[in-house]
Amino acid sequence: MKMVIVLVVWLALSAASASAMQMPCPCAGLQGLYGAGAGLTTMMGAGGLYPYAEYLRQPQCSPLAAAPYYAGCGQTSAMYQPLRQQCCQQQMRMMDVQSVAQQLQMMMQLERAATASSSLYEPALMQQQQQLLAAQGLNPMAMMMAQNMPAMGGLYQYQYQLPSYRTNPCGVSAAIPPYY
């Protein structure tokens, strides 16, 4: 029985190493770009760096998620640690800018709607709110944004993670045949 388990483990490892050998190594296309100050968009448009695009889609940019993409490389992952951090920081900055832009647009629409409805129905309440904000030295837009902006720490941590039932990237289940 132990021999069968050892044989199965050996076959699984050999199959994994064979698939890693067939995967194009992202190191080859990266050597010219590494340290050259190329941005994320330049690297993603390079065409030969498809594994890095897949890696960036992984949640949290974790080193464990990167293991399949660096498996075919003969170099250590310590060389790629600065690149990995740079990509994660760039990705977070892009998400932060998008989130702030969406929040600003939503807040401006809400402010317009609140101003229109308040001026028609409750001008005294609107005036009281403006006086309170002026006494505190706060801009109404800044106060509304501060109340409605989510905390940035860990917000995007699981944004791109697939649900547990969608683990197959193609969305096709091998165990359950499709219904016709």
UniProtKB/Swiss-Prot annotation:
It is found in: Vacuole, Aleurone grain. Keywords: Repeat, Seed storage protein, Signal, Storage protein, Vacuole. GO terms for cellular component: aleurone grain; vacuole. Its main location: other. Residues 1-19 form the signal peptide. The keyword Repeat applies. One of its GO terms (molecular function) is nutrient reservoir activity. The keyword Glycoprotein does not apply. Zeins are major seed storage proteins. This is Zein-beta. It comes from Zea mays.
